[in-house]
Amino acid sequence: MDTLRAGGAREGEPLVERLSTSSEVGFPGDWYALNSADHFWFDWRLRAAIRQWRACGLPLDRPLRVFDVGGGRGVLRDQVEAATAWTVDLVELNRAALDAAGPGRGRHLYYDVLDQRADLLGQYDAALMFDVIEHVERPRPLLDAVARHLRPEGWLLVNVPALQALFGAYDVAAGHFRRYDRASLGAELDGGRWRIDDQRYWGLSLVPLMAARKMLLRQATGETIHRSFGPFNGFVHRGLATLARVETALLPRAPIGSSVLLVARRCD
């Protein structure tokens, strides 16, 4: 195992552990540049997820061992560790993203879960796969590999973009193969390895905005992600952040939404 100090970090800063020899995964740089826990969308996603996890009985106050697959520069990891007692290992194949991640309670792993290292199999209580599987042409092998890293009855926590009718230039620019509904997301977990406990949409209020985005952005360009995801001016951002808080509080199960959250458990 190669242990590399992230981005030339000083003593005490996080280490990147290179566990795989897989080629680095490219990703639109604008996406990482816009990632921030302060961005209304990331805050909205976390609020919706925490509400779902509580409803499903996940023990937020216990020190679960969790791994965040495709966790980027650690925005979700930071949010989850701040909101729970969990220790989250950041798993990523984009070295620049790992270098940009700050310290957390867990490890920073340059690791392809398809490698299925023996020392990591069956070691985790839960896996986070937020906005990952839509980037994978064939998600089943990845999901099977993730399952093998979980303990029996371990949780799989997923978020994906919703409603194929909204698929447009933004999705192309972001590297999406598809958007999901509850049925198509559930179908990815067929095969007897998973028991789905809950699926729910969030972001109902964003659906008309994303429909407008699809109509306005006809072709993916180098500016598509930046134009679609911000940064927004202060007034617009505060309005969307308020909308997120209100919708999450009043509408825990939206009939449709811009994203779908899933909680499943390993049952094989």
Residue ranges and their predicted role:
Residues 28-31, 75-76, 198-241, 257-259:
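Conserved catalytic loop of SAM-dependent methyltransferase domains
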Residues 30-36, 156-178, 182-188:
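Short, glycine-/aromatic-enriched active-site segment of Class I SAM-dependent methyltransferases
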Residues 97, 164-166, 205:
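Feature marks short, surface-exposed loop/turn motifs that line or immediately flank catalytic pockets
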Residues 136-140, 160:
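A structural helix-start
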Residues 140-155:
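A short glycine-rich, Lys/Arg-flanked "PGG" loop and its adjoining helix->strand segment in the class I
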Residues 186-200:
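A SAM-dependent methyltransferase catalytic signature shared across enzymes that methylate proteins
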